Structures are given as structure tokens and as C-alpha cells.
Amino acid sequence: MTAVDAPDILDYDEVLTKYEPVMGMEVHVELGTATKMFCPCPTEFGAEPNTQVCPVCLGMPGSLPVVNAAAVESAIRIGLALNCSITPWGRFARKNYFYPDQPKNYQISQYDEPIATEGYLDVILDDGTTWRVDIERAHMEEDTGKSLHVGGATGRIHGASHSLLDYNRAGVPLVEIVTKTIHGAGERAPEVARAYVTALRDLLKSLDVSDVRMDQGSMRCDANISLMPIGAKELGTRTETKNVNSLKSVEVAVRYEMRRQAAVLDAGGEVIQETRHFQEADGTTAAGRRKETAEDYRYFPEPDLEPVAPSAEWVEELRGTLPELPWIRRARIQKDWGISDEVMRDLVNAGAIDLVIATTEAGASPEAARSWWLSYLSQQANTRGVELGALPITPAQVAQVVALIDSGKLNNKVARQVVDHVLDGEGDPEQVVAAHPELVVERDETKLKAAVDEALAANPDIADKIRSGKVQAAGKIVGDVMKATRGQADAARVKELVIEACS
């Protein structure tokens, strides 16, 4: 068979009638240590290029690495939280390959003796069912530098006039978490992939080992996808999709790659084993480099580092430091708040649990906090194309908005305008209200009564209906008053005044 381009991607439902998707997820997590994996260079995000480097992370001759103990501790805690076995004897290995963002021409990683093996993570799908994802391994390694390709239309090396290299990230501690083969998901494969990355992110956040900012690259997901013809016994050729930088993108990338591979196979071609880059703009994947095998990397034990041999006592001590893990916390919160499985599922799917908890801790009621994060703020996140937690508003600021509503200074409609100003960087809600007094709820009874009288005079037929006992007709008058006051009136008080005026 020859490699051919697909004439077009297949309809997703058609794919499922012919092929069974098989997945494997690789998630790289930058650990939140103060220094790099093998040297004392800082790990601050956003520093000037090439200002956080030294002879060790630049691979200068004669420099020797020293293992970051805090990174090893974080890796063990991750393994324990993933129900893994922690190795009593692990070694680092050199992964040999040439690429400009790897200054040593090899990466210090772990190969056949990783820190953690044989675990699992139970994830919740959209309908509330649980899917168990088996973990093959979690291993420690150092991150690479960053390449910036200049002059091309796509930001990739193809077509670029030149490339710039920033080695600040080179040597930052990583834990790579690799799943076993995920099969049997069928049409839900993209959903399972997204749910897994969501659950893993929440777990890592609860451990406080990383800020897991996908938008900043501190959590990066690679999705390995292949298709098996239904009834076949042999696995298909896999591709590895990279550059998947959001939870939504995980699902979109897996779905697209399934459709693309199916089209290639239906056209009589063969899927090439390669890396592919996810294109956020249109939800497609583009070909990268041919995918190497483990043999191509010529792994061998790192001669400059001793094995990592955590004692059983130390491992148990670290087990005792694990916090309340997400699934335990969810059960407790659901009981404490008295919410349904459906509401809890919405909170999980939106990634809003921590945000709601923090908002309640800042003074808002659980009901108000949930309402804001699951409704208006979720809409704003979708509009801006960011994750909910990346919105430029804090739980404390949301709690301030709730307090302003409870005090009667704002109504729900105007409160949304205040939130918009906060999202635009105009300060805390109290500062926004001070700068925009027109947003404060109108409390002058004389003005409100005048507006009510004017609306009733303009609608005598509705006034007659209200006088005859059809109180529901007051809604039209209330709406006119709200329009006249530009939404600043308290709708409940306006309705009271309308009924009083017609009695």
C-alpha cells in the first residue's frame, strides 16, 4: 500500500461503522519547583529569553547534573495519587536525538526504570458514568527549550526565514504520564480523552505540584490515535497529535484525527506513523515529522547520575501528605451543598469546582457562586475562547458582585455589566461601581413612581387588566419601567409600585 492524502475527511458516524478507535494519552506536566531538574537555574515563566540558563542546562562540557529532590518528591506524590507502584530503584537515561531546542543533543529522561508504574485514574463522563483509564507509567525528565520560527505564515519551521531559540525552559522538571492503550470507547473516544485530561488536571492541581496552565505550556497533551477495522485483531498505525493546548482541543483533535485516518484508509492509502500538529484555528491536524521508535533514541543509563532509590518509609511519609483528592472532595461537597449528580457533573465538566469553592470562601452563597460560574462567566469564557479559570476575574471579585446584589446596589442585569468592566481590566467591582454610578440601582421612590405612572398612562388597557385582578399583566409595565431606567431599577420593587398604583 502507498501513503496517500485523504480526499476528504469522513463523517464521524461513518467512521464508527467501519473502525474502532484506539488511543493512548501522554501528558507532560511541568513541576512547580523553584529550580530546574538538574541545576539551580530558576524556572520563572515569562522571563527574558536565555536569562535563566547555566552551563548544566546548556550542556557545556564538564558540567555535571544534580537531581532536584523536590522534583522527585512531586513525582512520587503524583504516582501515589494515580494509584501507581513506586519503584524502589529507578534510573535516569539519556534519550539521544538532535533538535535545536535540545542543547545537549540528548534529553535526560527515564526509560525502562521509571519512578511510577501500573496505576489508574477513574474519570467521569458527561452522562455521569465512570471510565477507568489505566496508567502505564509516570516518569521524570527535563523539558526542552522553545523555538520561535520567524517569517512564515504558520509559525512553524516550514516557510520560516529563521528561528530563535530560548533555553529558559530547557531543564525545567517534567513528569510525563503515559496511559495504557485505551480501547472500547467507540464513539465516546474523544469524550474519554477530554474527560481524562480534565480529571488529571484537577488531580495535579489538588496536589499543588504544578499550575497546570495548558495555555502557558505547563501541562501539554499528546494524543496517540489509531484505527482498527471492526473485527480486526491487529492495531492500526498510530499518529501522535501535539500542540493540544486546551481541554476542548483534546476532544476536537481526537475526533478530527479519527475522521482523517478513516478517509486515508478508505482511499486505499496507509496511515503514516508521524507526529501531527493540532491547528487551533480550524480544528484540523497538519503533518509534522516522521515518528521515531524507542530504538531510534538509543537510550542508555545516564552515567552522571546515581539511581533514584526512594525508601519505603519515605514513600509512606509522602503518602501521608496527600491532600483530599478530587473524587473524595466532590462527594463531600455534593453532600454538604445538597446538590444533584447532574449539578455536580456540570461543575466538573466546566472545571468550576475550585472556582465555586473559592467564591463561597470569599462570602458568596454556594447557589449564587454556582450560578455565576456556570452561566454568565461560562458564556464569557466561550466567547473569549479561554478556559473558565483563565478569565481575568477572581473568585473574590465574583463574591463582591454577589454582595453588591445582596445589598441592593445592583440587580442581576446591571451586575453583568459590572462583571464586563471587571473582565476588561477596570478593577474590582466596588471600583467599577464607583467609576460608573449610572450602574447603581435606582432607589429614589419619587423617580420610580413617576416612571410607573408614565408607563401606566401609556398603556391604559394593561392598567385596567391589573385593576381587574390580572396581576401577571404587570410584567409589561415593569419591562417598560426597566427600559426607561436603563435597567437600573429593582424589578421586584417596580412590580410592587405598579400593583400599588392600580389598587
Swiss-Prot record:
Organism domain of life: Bacteria
Top EC class, one word: ligase
Annotated catalysed reactions: L-glutamyl-tRNA(Gln) + L-glutamine + ATP + H2O = L-glutaminyl-tRNA(Gln) + L-glutamate + ADP + phosphate + H(+); L-aspartyl-tRNA(Asn) + L-glutamine + ATP + H2O = L-asparaginyl-tRNA(Asn) + L-glutamate + ADP + phosphate + 2 H(+)
One Gene Ontology MF term: asparaginyl-tRNA synthase (glutamine-hydrolyzing) activity
E.C. code: 6.3.5.-
GO process terms (BP): glutaminyl-tRNAGln biosynthesis via transamidation; translation
Pfam families named in the record: GatB_N, GatB_Yqey
Keyword Protein biosynthesis carried by entry: yes
SUPFAM superfamilies in the cross-refs: GatB/YqeY motif (SSF89095), Glutamine synthetase/guanido kinase (SSF55931)
InterPro entries (UniProt xref): Asn/Gln-tRNA_amidoTrfase_suB/E (IPR017959), Asn/Gln-tRNA_Trfase_suB/E_cat (IPR006075), Asn/Gln_amidotransferase (IPR018027), Asn/Gln_tRNA_amidoTrase-B-like (IPR003789), GatB (IPR004413), GatB_Yqey_C_2 (IPR023168), Gln_synth/guanido_kin_cat_dom (IPR014746)
Keywords for the protein's UniProt record, in alphabetical order: ATP-binding, Ligase, Nucleotide-binding, Protein biosynthesis
Signal peptide start and end residues: none
Residue ranges crossing the lipid bilayer per the database entry: none
Similarity field: Belongs to the GatB/GatE family. GatB subfamily.
Reported function: Allows the formation of correctly charged Asn-tRNA(Asn) or Gln-tRNA(Gln) through the transamidation of misacylated Asp-tRNA(Asn) or Glu-tRNA(Gln) in organisms which lack either or both of asparaginyl-tRNA or glutaminyl-tRNA synthetases. The reaction takes place in the presence of glutamine and ATP through an activated phospho-Asp-tRNA(Asn) or phospho-Glu-tRNA(Gln).
PANTHER family the record matches: GLUTAMYL-TRNA GLN AMIDOTRANSFERASE SUBUNIT B MITOCHONDRIAL AND PROKARYOTIC PET112-RELATED, GLUTAMYL-TRNA(GLN) AMIDOTRANSFERASE SUBUNIT B, MITOCHONDRIAL
NCBIfam families recorded: gatB, PRK05477.1-2, PRK05477.1-3, PRK05477.1-4
Subunit structure as annotated in this protein's UniProt entry: Heterotrimer of A, B and C subunits.
Name used for this protein in its record: Aspartyl/glutamyl-tRNA(Asn/Gln) amidotransferase subunit B
Gene from which the chain derives: gatB
